[in-house]
C-alpha cells in the first residue's frame, strides 16, 4: 500500500507505487478530532475510518487527536466535559488507553499522528507526550502497525512512482 520513511519527527516521506494509470491510492487526512470530548461524533468518525479501511487508504492525523482539557493545572477544565470512562486519578492514562483500543482496527492504516495545540499544552503543563504514548502503545498491541508520531509543524512529502517515473507533492501541517 505505502512505505513510510521518517527523516525526523517533523519530516516524513510516503512512497506510493502505482502499477498503472488507473491505480488509485487514497489518504484520509484528519485534524481536530478531540476524541475524548463528549462532542466528538465517534459514529461519524468510525464511518469515515471504516471507509478508509475499505479503500485501503493511509490515515494521517494532523493535530488534536485528543482534547484532554480536564487535567490538573489546565485553566480550561470543566468536569462537565469529562466522559465517565475518563473520570479517575490517572485521567491521561485512561484517555490514551481507551483511544488505543478504539483505534486498533485502523492501526495498520495509520501513517502519522501529529500533536496539535491541545497536546502541546498538555506537554507544557503536565510533562506528558500523549501522541508519543498513543503511537507507541498502538505499535505494541498491533505488531504490523508502523504509525509515527509527527511534530507540531510537520512536512510530509508524498512520492508517487510508476514504471520508473516519479512525481511528488508536499503536505505541510501546523
Regions inferred by a protein language model and the residue ranges of each:
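Core catalytic region of metal-dependent phosphoesterases/phosphodiesterases
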Residues: 15-25, 35-148
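A short catalytic or substrate-binding loop motif that flags glycine-/basic-rich loops and adjacent residues
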Residues: 5-9, 146-151
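Short, structured patches in soluble enzyme cores that scaffold and shape functional sites
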Residues: 115, 160, 171-174
